[in-house]
């Protein structure tokens, strides 16, 4: 069964603004590039093609430099609209797609081959994100409408069942972690050995230790 991985990527200059107290704009861009290397590299070992869709020429140029297939968004689309465009692009050639964000750098720690095996036993495979989102979705192109956004995990399950599709939930810590906060950076440092993202954060002199405050982890930066 031919499989295409679809990775939507926001503009480098607009992404991860919640990390602005911790990382400068250029550092956030560097982290985004490192995470895209991790995600695309982990998927490329198990699928027939990795496709990056973006409205940002800089993103597309960088993805192309990594040897990835690129697709420019048509017009002003939201995330679901961009992904629908990407699925339509894949439909003539591929039997299924695996959709992942570009900010789950620990995906290589998960068993991607086992994740894809689940797709042979169900019409739709969903890996939840922390907070009720969706961090991985496997399905036939255009099998159902996409509902990425707040609480999309539950909306995708509902949408699939409304279409009469069988659903398999793949629960994985490594797939659930998307990067939005300084504490998430700490999780990468703790669990991301061998990833480009961890190496990048180490170069920026970030360290992590257990926190005695409200957060589980205390992430700091050496001078």
From Swiss-Prot:
It is an enzyme of class 2 (transferase). It catalyses: (2S)-2-phospholactate + GTP + H(+) = (2S)-lactyl-2-diphospho-5'-guanosine + diphosphate. One of its GO terms (molecular function) is GTP binding. Guanylyltransferase that catalyzes the activation of (2S)-2-phospholactate (2-PL) as (2S)-lactyl-2-diphospho-5'-guanosine, via the condensation of 2-PL with GTP. It is involved in the biosynthesis of coenzyme F420, a hydride carrier cofactor. HAMAP family: CofC. Belongs to the CofC family. This is 2-phospho-L-lactate guanylyltransferase. The lineage of its organism: Archaea, Methanobacteriati, Methanobacteriota, Methanomada group, Methanobacteria.
């Amino acid at each position: 069964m031919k499989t295409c991985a679809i990775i939507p990527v926001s503009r480098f200059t607009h992404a991860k603004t919640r990390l602005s107290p911790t990382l400068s704009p250029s550092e956030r861009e560097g982290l985004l590039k490192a995470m895209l290397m991790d995600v695309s590299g982990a998927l490329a070992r198990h699928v027939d093609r990795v496709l990056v869709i973006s409205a940002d020429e800089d993103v597309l140029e960088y993805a192309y430099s990594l040897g990835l297939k690129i697709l420019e968004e048509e017009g002003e689309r939201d995330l679901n609209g961009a992904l629908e465009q990407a699925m339509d692009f894949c439909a003539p050639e591929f039997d299924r797609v695996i959709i992942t964000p570009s900010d789950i750098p620990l995906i290589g720690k998960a068993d991607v081959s086992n994740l894809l095996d689940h797709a042979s036993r169900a019409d739709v495979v969903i890996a939840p994100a922390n907070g009720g989102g969706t961090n991985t979705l496997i399905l036939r192109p255009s099998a159902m409408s996409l509902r990425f956004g707040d609480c999309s995990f539950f909306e995708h399950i509902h949408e699939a069942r409304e279409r009469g599709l069988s659903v398999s939930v793949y629960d994985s810590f490594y797939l659930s972690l998307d990067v939005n906060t300084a504490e998430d950076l700490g999780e990468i440092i703790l669990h991301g050995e061998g990833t480009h993202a961890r190496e990048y954060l180490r170069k920026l002199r970030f360290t992590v230790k257990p926190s005695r405050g409200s957060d589980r982890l205390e992430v700091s930066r050496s001078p």
